[in-house]
């Protein structure tokens, strides 16, 4: 299973990182870090297509997606096109990501940043805060509900928002147990990488009002976004489609219907 494999490798890598910089030293360094920006405000704008645009070099299923990968150049195009937030992959082995991409983009742009990774430890949340992320991804499928709540509350204590990703009703139960306020519905099954494009239609009616809902994966045109917005989605996480376009700026504008 792909998800299990990635998480196993993440845990091993994390132990090595912790040896060089223990959590107590990492937390002490947070006093000099950026102040997180208001993510919820930008994701729930009613009169716009709110896009979380991904900065992603590779994936386990597709390999290298963008050969000429320049995270800052991509971020500039996204920002010029008016995206609501960036999603920056930081997982190094399967997605060829890096925390340094967050630090770089944070330094030169004003758009909120999601650390997209396979977070299994509070250490990674402290890292996200130190490098300049404004919110983090937690994958409900990867962890039990009690540990999810521990991670969620730690993130909140650092003033980071959390995008809680779900794929089925069991995941949704975990998200509601945690009282997540931003819930992402991933059309892609992270165990098999199969897609279910009807998932938002099935799950959105089960989510209490007042939650911010993000539709994720497999979105390619403006009409899909408009339809999902009518169903109750507030924002859309889009990555691979933009990475494959010659003009990222034009691709975002097309997606937004502008």
Swiss-Prot record:
Annotated keywords: Amino-acid biosynthesis, Aromatic amino acid biosynthesis, Decarboxylase, Lyase, Tryptophan biosynthesis
UniProt enzyme class: lyase
Catalysed reaction equations from the record: 1-(2-carboxyphenylamino)-1-deoxy-D-ribulose 5-phosphate + H(+) = (1S,2R)-1-C-(indol-3-yl)glycerol 3-phosphate + CO2 + H2O
CDD domains tied to this protein: IGPS
Pathway stated in the Swiss-Prot or TrEMBL entry: Amino-acid biosynthesis; L-tryptophan biosynthesis; L-tryptophan from chorismate: step 4/5
Keyword Lyase applies: yes
SUPFAM superfamilies attached to this UniProt entry: Ribulose-phoshate binding barrel
InterPro entries for this protein: Aldolase_TIM (IPR013785), Indole-3-glycerol_P_synth (IPR045186), Indole-3-glycerol_P_synth_dom (IPR013798), Indole-3-GlycerolPSynthase_CS (IPR001468), RibuloseP-bd_barrel (IPR011060)
Pfam families per the UniProt record, alphabetical: IGPS
Record-listed E.C. numbers: 4.1.1.48
GO BP annotation list: L-tryptophan biosynthetic process
A Gene Ontology molecular function term of the record: indole-3-glycerol-phosphate synthase activity
Family classification: Belongs to the TrpC family.
HAMAP family registered for this protein in UniProt: IGPS_B (MF_00134_B)
Protein name per UniProt: Indole-3-glycerol phosphate synthase
Source species of the chain: Campylobacter fetus subsp. fetus (strain 82-40)
Gene: trpC
């Amino acid at each position: 299973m792909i998800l299990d494999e990635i998480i196993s490798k993440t845990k091993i890598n994390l132990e090595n990182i912790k040896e060089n910089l223990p959590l107590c030293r990492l937390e002490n360094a947070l006093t000099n870090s950026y102040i997180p920006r208001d993510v919820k405000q930008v994701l729930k704008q009613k009169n716009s297509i709110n896009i979380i645009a991904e900065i992603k070099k590779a994936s386990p299923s597709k390999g290298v997606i963008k050969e000429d990968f320049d995270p800052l150049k991509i971020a500039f195009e996204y920002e010029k096109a008016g995206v609501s937030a960036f999603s920056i992959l930081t997982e190094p082995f399967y997605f060829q990501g890096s925390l340094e991409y967050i630090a770089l983009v944070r330094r030169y742009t004003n758009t909120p940043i999601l650390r997209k990774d396979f977070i299994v430890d509070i250490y990674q949340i402290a890292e996200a805060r130190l490098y300049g992320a404004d919110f983090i991804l937690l994958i409900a499928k990867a962890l039990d509900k009690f540990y999810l709540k521990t991670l969620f509350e730690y993130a909140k204590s650092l003033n980071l928002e959390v995008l809680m990703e779900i794929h089925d009703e069991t995941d949704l139960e975990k998200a509601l147990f945690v009282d997540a306020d931003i819930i992402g519905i991933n059309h892609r099954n992270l165990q098999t990488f199969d897609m279910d494009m009807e998932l938002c239609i099935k799950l959105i009616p089960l989510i209490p009002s007042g939650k911010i809902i993000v539709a994720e994966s497999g979105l390619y045109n403006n009409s899909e976004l408009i339809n999902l917005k009518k169903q109750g989605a507030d924002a859309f996480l889009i990555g691979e489609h933009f990475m494959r376009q010659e003009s990222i700026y034009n691709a975002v504008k097309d997606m937004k219907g502008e």
